[in-house]
Amino acid sequence: MLNTTATIDPQRGRRPAFRLHLYRSSAATRGLPTALALFMAYVAVELCIWLFCRDISDAVAFFPSNGVLVAALLLLSPRLGLAFCLACFGIDIVHNWIGRIDLTHALVFSSLNQALAIGAAALTRTFCGAALDLSRARRLVTFALIAAASAALEGMVGQILLGLLDGASNDVFHAWLQWTLEDGLGLLIATPAALLPFKQKRLFDVAGGARLERPLLLAITVALTVAAFAFDRFIAVTLVMPVLVLTAFRAGPGWVYGSVLTTSVIAMALTANGHGPIAFMAPTAPYRQEFMVQLFIASTFATAVPAAAALGARN
């Protein structure tokens, strides 16, 4: 367990370098009901990915499961968090095995997911404040850097391990970039989406919209995303963005993260199954498909989340 504090050097009168905290004794922790809710969310995400989101190369463009795992490590007690990690490790192994991945590679991928989640959780606990309010602009930027750096390091280690197992690859950079974006976007979007209902539930009701307006905006976003990625016309994709901005103004950060997460999964699933403008443009190029889906996901995040953070700071 990472849990240390900085002390003042009496001879020099200054603090030494920071140290990471995965757990703080003063931090409030959640119990079994929260663990069960997060575990059900983790299983649901894994099942959705397995059933709907794998492309022709058996890969995915966006992996939000690790974000749920990070949220659990930040919310649960050390003992419950360890049990949660072990349970998710088992689910991940089964997921990879069902996906026709041999046991050695399944262990590598699942272990890297665990390491990524633990590292990202420790960095988030250390640098994003005790309240873990990732809806605030400054903490959101900090967390975005944490997600990007953690995923980039995990992708690099993963490519090295795959090189040792399978031999040198002819496309290491694109494989590393896809891995980094897949897990980085998963952390960036899914971690706040999983944290907000437990840490800042009020952020689901802070905007000026009526109670019925919020789920209605989510339903419109889902419908537009399905329509945009069910047909081969790129212009329809642009219709999603104004609704996400409207959600930021009328529904608040909680609904924004839920909308971005839902939009991302729908876009990934339909593209992976050969539907929509991205699949039409690159029907046999999985890296290109994945990168364009990742670009769309990043665009939806950049369109709505900073606006919600700015409005939250103003309010």
Describe the predicted segments one by one:
Residues 172-186, 285-295:
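Short aromatic-rich membrane-water interface segments that cap or initiate transmembrane helices
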